[in-house]
């Protein structure tokens, strides 16, 4: 998409990019390094960390933190622990509030724009 003329100044949302401030989150640098190394070894055409990769990785971080915190794999125990605690992830600090269980966090969602063929957080 970045190479198409029609995509100039396109907007998208993101929760993770391979630059600051995203790379300051706990484990982000090692996550990026590992993703690049494994992607290159697998001969992937692109080894850039994208939104979906970071969400998947953070999901496992959340599950690990909840299982360790609740000392259980019971879904009700995990949910109860998550409602009372936050999880520091590669996407930043995550927490859950209210009946919807919507993932919250300070400034998690950002807008990025395609500028000169590169995505830039605006």
Placement of each model-derived feature along the sequence:
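Segments of small-molecule ligand-sensing domains
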Residues: 38-121
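Extracellular/periplasmic periplasmic-binding protein-like sensory domains
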Residues: 1-57, 119
